[in-house]
Structure formats: C-alpha cells, structure tokens
C-alpha cells in the first residue's frame, strides 16, 4: 500500500506580506495603507509644523503662524514665492540645497503638504476600493470620494499649474482659503461661471436631499418598540424594514405629485447630485487655470459706460471685481511693487 503525502505549497514573501496587510485588526492596513498612512501622516504633520512655526514673511510679506500671533482661523501654510515658479521645491533641490530653514522660508512646506495630501486622498480612495472588494460590495463609496479628490487636485494643483507659479494656489488655512475665494471672484468672475453654478446646485442640492431623506425616514419609522426613545427599537441585524417606504411615497406624492418609488434610484440620485456638483466645479477650476472667460455681458458693460443712469447687478459686480483686482493685487503680490494712480481705481457710475 502506497501513501502519498502532499507537500504544502511554498509561500513566497508576497503571500506572507499580503496576509499580514489584510489581517483583521482594529485599523485595517491593506495595500492602500502603504500609500495612505505615510502620506497622510506627513501632510498633517507638515501642516501642523507650518501653522505653528513657519512665517510667510519671505513669500507673502505676512505673518502666518501661531508663533507670530495668529490663531486657528488666521494661521496658514503659505504658497511658495512667485519666483519659485512650478518647482517641486525638494529639500535637497537647487533652491534650498538641503537647508531646512531656507526651505521653509521659500515655501517648501506648502509643496510638501500639497503633494503628500493629494497622494493621501488617493490612498484613502484606494482603501475604500480595497475594503469593498474584500467585503464583497460595490465600490460606490470610492467613486463618490473621487469628487473631493477632483476638487483638491484641480484647486491646489491644476489651477496654479495653469498660472505662473504655485504662488497663486490657495494657502492651507481658513482665512487663506477665503482670500483665495475673493481672488477667484476678482480675477475670474467665478460666481458667474456656469460650472460654479452647477457646483453650488450639486452641493446645496445634495444637502437638501440629505435633509429631506433623513426627515422622511424619521417621519415614517415603524412603531416597533415600547421605549420612549425610538432609536432603541432598532437592531443592526434585524431583517425587517425599519421605516415604511410606501408611506413615504404616499407623503411625497401628495406634496409634489411625484415621488421616488424605488429605493435604489433614490439613493443613486443622492449619490449622483453632490458628486456631479464636485466634478463640474473641478472642471470649472481647470477652465480658470487656462484663464477661460464665461458670461461676459460686454453689451451691458458698454451701455453702462456710456449711460450713467444704466446699471445692472452684472455691471455692479464688474465694478466690484475691478475693485478687488486694484486693491488686492498690491497687497497680495508685494514683490511686483504695483502702484495704481487714483484715476484708474474703479468708481461707481454715480460718482
């Protein structure tokens, strides 16, 4: 009698590493974690370091750190000096030559945070793809997260790449982002851009859908518990529905005359609206990077210039944009030494 004993298959280093990365632990690592965790750690650490210690005196002529007296709303990691162009500003590059202090003064931390932040966001999206595949569900979470990634990449990377340097990107700070919004309005008339309009419709529409959906579900919960708190009547593993889709459909049919009767369409619509808003606004920002114009009603501008009594909300906004450009440019770009004589500063038609 012959007994054959099978030899266990050889496990290579890749299989061992794959098992370790995908092990069930409190914080899942996975292959995406190799990209996500180091880049997110460095991006957040760089931002905390910059807002705490690093000045923007050499790049923007302003104070931007807690050390200089800023608070959480006014501190920022500022963009590099305009003279740096689109350099990656590597610490060991020709600009800083390994000098960490000089690297910080030139704005190297901004490039560091922006690039590591972009890769961290991509790593987080890949993490959602990876876990969805392991759990056996569809990857719509990752697809939805492509919206914020598109906005980050278009605003912080694509826009300054279309301009003369990284200097014109937003700095990483609350007040700094507000300044960038004013800049986009003054120099690009961004609020009148159709892609901005689609973005606003998507984001605010998504918020409205979220509020309506949450309220409707709360309105139509089944009375399936004796407790005073209705939340205690729900069990995550229960098989039966927790709210009545039929009742919700009847309610909104009476309100609007039309309502979703399919939960799958309803939730896809709630996914589609805000994500499309993010995507379209990202496309618009790329248009601004190329200095494309949208909705310039020149005929109204010409008539307003010829007729002091003719003015529209559009022409008033154009004057405001001129004011933003004239008063913002000297303060925002001190290295250019802009000086505007009084006669070229914008004045209303009635003045």
UniProtKB/Swiss-Prot annotation:
GO MF terms listed in the record are:
chlorophyll binding; electron transporter, transferring electrons within the cyclic electron transport pathway of photosynthesis activity; iron ion binding; oxygen evolving activity
Q: Where does chlorophyll a PD2 bind?
A: 196
Instruction: For this UniProt record, give its keywords in alphabetical order, as a comma-separated list.
Output: Chlorophyll, Chromophore, Electron transport, Iron, Magnesium, Membrane, Metal-binding, Oxidoreductase, Photosynthesis, Photosystem II, Thylakoid, Transmembrane, Transmembrane helix, Transport
Binding of chlorophyll a ChlzD2, residues: 116
What EC number(s) has UniProt assigned to this enzyme? 1.10.3.9
Provide the cofactor note recorded for this chain's UniProt entry. Answer: The D1/D2 heterodimer binds P680, chlorophylls that are the primary electron donor of PSII, and subsequent electron acceptors. It shares a non-heme iron and each subunit binds pheophytin, quinone, additional chlorophylls, carotenoids and lipids. There is also a Cl(-1) ion associated with D1 and D2, which is required for oxygen evolution. The PSII complex binds additional chlorophylls, carotenoids and specific lipids.
* EC class: oxidoreductase
Asked if the keyword Acetylation belongs to this entry, the reply reads no
Question: Which compartment or compartments is the protein found in?
Answer: Cellular thylakoid membrane
Q: In Gene Ontology terms, what is a biological process of this protein? A: photosynthetic electron transport in photosystem II
Under Pfam families, the record lists: Photo_RC
Additional comment: 2 of the reaction center chlorophylls (ChlD1 and ChlD2) are entirely coordinated by water.
What is known about its subunit structure? PSII is composed of 1 copy each of membrane proteins PsbA, PsbB, PsbC, PsbD, PsbE, PsbF, PsbH, PsbI, PsbJ, PsbK, PsbL, PsbM, PsbT, PsbX, PsbY, PsbZ, Psb30/Ycf12, peripheral proteins PsbO, CyanoQ (PsbQ), PsbU, PsbV and a large number of cofactors. It forms dimeric complexes.
What protein family is recorded?
Belongs to the reaction center PufL/M/PsbA/D family.
Q: What protein name is recorded for this chain?
A: Photosystem II D2 protein
Name the source organism: Parasynechococcus marenigrum (strain WH8102)
Lineage, uppermost ranks: Bacteria, Bacillati, Cyanobacteriota, Cyanophyceae, Synechococcales
């Amino acid at each position: 009698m012959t007994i054959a004993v099978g030899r266990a298959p050889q496990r290579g280093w890749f299989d061992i590493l794959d098992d370790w990365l995908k092990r069930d632990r409190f914080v899942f690592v996975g292959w995406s974690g190799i990209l996500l965790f180091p880049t997110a750690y460095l991006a957040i650490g760089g931002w905390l370091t910059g807002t705490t210690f690093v000045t923007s005196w050499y790049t923007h002529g302003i104070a931007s750190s807690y050390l200089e007296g800023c608070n959480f709303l006014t501190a920022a990691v500022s963009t590099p000096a305009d003279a740096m162009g689109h350099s990656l500003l590597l610490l060991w590059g020709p600009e800083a030559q390994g000098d960490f202090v000089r690297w910080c003064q030139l704005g190297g931390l901004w490039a560091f945070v922006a690039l590591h932040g972009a890769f961290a966001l991509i790593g987080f999206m890949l993490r959602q793809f990876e876990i969805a595949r392991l759990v056996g569900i569809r990857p719509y979470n990752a697809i939805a997260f492509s919206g914020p990634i598109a906005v980050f990449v278009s605003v912080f990377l694509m826009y300054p790449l279309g301009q003369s340097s990284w200097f014109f990107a937003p700095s990483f700070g609350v007040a700094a982002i507000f300044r960038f919004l004013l800049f986009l309005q003054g120099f690009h008339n961004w609020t009148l851009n159709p892609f901005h309009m689609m973005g606003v419709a998507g984001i605010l529409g998504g918020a409205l859908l979220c509020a309506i959906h949450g309220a409707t579900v709360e309105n139509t919960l089944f009375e399936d518990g004796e407790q005073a708190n209705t939340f205690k009547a729900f069990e995550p593993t229960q098989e039966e529905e927790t709210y009545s889709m039929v009742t919700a459909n009847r309610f909104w049919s009476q309100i609007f005359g039309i309502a979703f009767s399919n939960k799958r369409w309803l939730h896809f619509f709630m996914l589609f609206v805000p994500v499309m808003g993010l995507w379209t606004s990202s496309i618009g920002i790329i248009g601004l990077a190329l200095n494309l114009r949208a909705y310039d009603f020149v005929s109204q501008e010409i008539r307003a210039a010829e007729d002091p009594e003719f003015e529209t909300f559009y022409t008033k906004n154009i004057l405001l944009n001129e004011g933003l450009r004239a008063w913002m440019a000297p303060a925002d770009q001190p290295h250019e030494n802009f000086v505007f004589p009084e006669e070229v500063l914008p004045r209303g038609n009635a003045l």
